[in-house]
């Protein structure tokens, strides 16, 4: 499967927290996802991933808040980024 990296960013939030965003464009959708993006957006605090949006093959689009996994309705890459940053803001406040 061919893939093209669209976004690979790391944002330091503070001394003990960072955000990592990786988005790939695939030649065909992953099993469980209707779109051609493969993504992982994560908030890591004190070395622990406390928030993550991803779409691993077979599971489809979902998010992890703490240890809880919740289905996520993917609309577009921009909405995905907005939703993720909104969750990061909630986590931090």
Describe each PLM feature range.
Residues 1-62:
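The feature represents the first ordered module of a protein
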């Amino acid at each position: 499967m061919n893939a093209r990296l669209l976004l690979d960013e790391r944002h330091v939030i503070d001394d003990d927290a960072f955000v990592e965003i990786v988005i790939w464009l695939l030649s065909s959708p992953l099993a469980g996802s209707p779109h051609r993006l493969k993504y992982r957006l994560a908030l890591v605090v004190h070395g622990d991933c406390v928030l993550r949006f991803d779409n691993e093959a077979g599971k489809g689009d979902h998010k992890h808040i703490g240890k809880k996994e919740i289905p996520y309705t993917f609309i577009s890459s921009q909405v995905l980024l907005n939703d993720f940053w909104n969750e990061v803001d909630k986590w931090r406040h």
